[in-house]
Every structure is written in C-alpha cells, then in structure tokens.
Amino acid sequence: MATANAEQSIGPPEQAQVIQPPLPATITDLAALLEIPLDDCLVPCNFCGNFLTYLEICEFDEKRLSLIWKEYLVYACCRCCCTATATFEFNEFYESTVTGREIEDVTGKSIFDIDVRCQTCMKYLDAIEKLDICGRRRPFHLVRGSWKGICRLCKHFYNDW
C-alpha cells in the first residue's frame, strides 16, 4: 500500500502552459507589433546605451541584424558600435582568408548559397557584392565561423573601386 501511494505525485495540479508568441527580430517587426510608426521607435544600443537614430534603425534592418532581448527589454546596435564590434571580431577571431571564387571550393557551396557579412559594417552582402569580390579576386575572410567581405559602401573607404 505504501509503494502505491509513493508512486503517485503529490503536489499542486499542473498549470496550463501559456504559449507566448516569439519576440520580434527586426525593428520593423517590433513597430508593427506595437502598432507605431517606425520613426517613433526608441531602441537603445546594446553596447553604448544611446538610442538609435531613425537612419540607424533603417540601417539595422537593412543589414539584416537581429534585435537582442534581455528580460523582455529590447536592444539593437548603433552604427558606431557595429563598426567597433566588426573590427573587434575580425581582430580577435580571424581564422583564414580565401581569394575570390576559392570560397566555393572551401565551402563546397555556390557563392549564392554562402552567407557573407561586411567585415567593416556587418551588412549582409547581396549576390552582386559577393560576385564583385569574386570577379575582382578580392579576399573573403573566415571570422568566428562566418564569412566576411567588403560591401559596396565600405569598399570606398578602402579606395578599392
């Protein structure tokens, strides 16, 4: 008799689990969820704490970066901190470099299927930017397991046009 009672769970009844919708990953999605205009969004930078300007909000989504959620508080990354973070990651976590189309041999994937971000501003490179790097035999760098190159805007800083 004692063993039969010991096997039964004694405690509070199971509570129904509340399923919460996923938190938005972009500032545009956040604005839509809150039903406010994009230019009314006040999102602080995760690193410096300054609120992103409207231009930085647009750049953040254009770069295909994701919002950071900490205990239901949202953070993004401003332009200056994006550049600083990209530089830090490159300097601390650099792994290797390939030139132009060699990236396809190393990864075993088509250039169109390889995710590449700008090593300077963290923008997600489009197909034209990746093909430009391949065609001009410029470098792709493997940094922290992700491929980096130079986007069309940042290549002007390097006088590489």
Swiss-Prot record:
GO cellular component: host cell cytoplasm; host cell nucleus
GO molecular function: DNA binding; zinc ion binding
Keyword annotations from UniProtKB, A to Z: Activator, DNA-binding, Early protein, Host cytoplasm, Host nucleus, Host-virus interaction, Inhibition of host innate immune response by virus, Metal-binding, Modulation of host cell apoptosis by virus, Transcription, Transcription regulation, Viral immunoevasion, Zinc, Zinc-finger
Zinc finger residue extent: unnamed: 45-81, 118-154
GO BP annotations, alphabetical order: DNA-templated transcription; regulation of DNA-templated transcription; symbiont-mediated perturbation of host apoptosis; symbiont-mediated perturbation of host ubiquitin-like protein modification; symbiont-mediated suppression of host innate immune response; symbiont-mediated suppression of host type I interferon-mediated signaling pathway
Cellular compartments annotated: Host cytoplasm; Host nucleus
HAMAP family xrefs: HPV_E6
Subunit structure: Forms homodimers. Interacts with ubiquitin-protein ligase UBE3A/E6-AP; this interaction stimulates UBE3A ubiquitin activity. Interacts with host BAK1.
Family in the record: Belongs to the papillomaviridae E6 protein family.
Described purpose of this protein according to its UniProt entry: Plays a major role in the induction and maintenance of cellular transformation. E6 associates with host UBE3A/E6-AP ubiquitin-protein ligase and modulates its activity. Protects host keratinocytes from apoptosis by mediating the degradation of host BAK1. May also inhibit host immune response.
Annotated protein name in UniProt: Protein E6
Species this protein is from: Human papillomavirus 25
Name of the encoding gene: E6
